[in-house]
């Protein structure tokens, strides 16, 4: 009997720490026995709500970072498009100036030749005042030269207008390409935004 009592005491002493641990994890006093069950459930629910709150805050932070990145991407895309448009406008201006200078020089050269022909005709006319045949020949040559000069001016004008038309066509094609690239970039951005929106919206727990 004494041995049995001793073992019983050892068992009681061995269970004592376990009871202390249980009481530490479940600090319920006798006063808590009369506590409202809803308050007890509320206490156990608070840590879960805190975890869900932290999880929701982390998702919102990530979404905010994604939105900032998307805004930076849009700004960079529009900046690149503006640079391309400015470069296109500068190139157009340079090409137009080059065409104007080219045909301006040709016009000046042609009119200078025309003036020289008129001056030569006047000189020949003065020399051939007393020679009717020479005068007729000089007149014929002058008319032929003037006709050729006018024809050359007409051809140059047509070439000038054709050059301007080709320049406008090329500029339109380049603008169309820039617009196409911008639309393509916006389409990619829209798909990426929808993908990330669906991804993070599915991460939230259902309200049901």
Curated annotation (Swiss-Prot):
UniProt-listed InterPro entries: XLR/SYCP3, XLR/SYCP3/FAM9_dom
Similarity-based family: Belongs to the XLR/SYCP3 family.
Tissues and organs where the protein is expressed, per its UniProt entry: Expressed in lymphoid cells.
Pfam families per record: Cor1
Residue ranges that the Swiss-Prot or TrEMBL entry lists as coiled coil: 122-143
Residue ranges with Basic and acidic residues bias: 22-33
Swiss-Prot/TrEMBL keywords: Coiled coil
This protein's name: X-linked lymphocyte-regulated protein PM1
Chain intervals for the UniProt region annotation (Disordered): 1-43
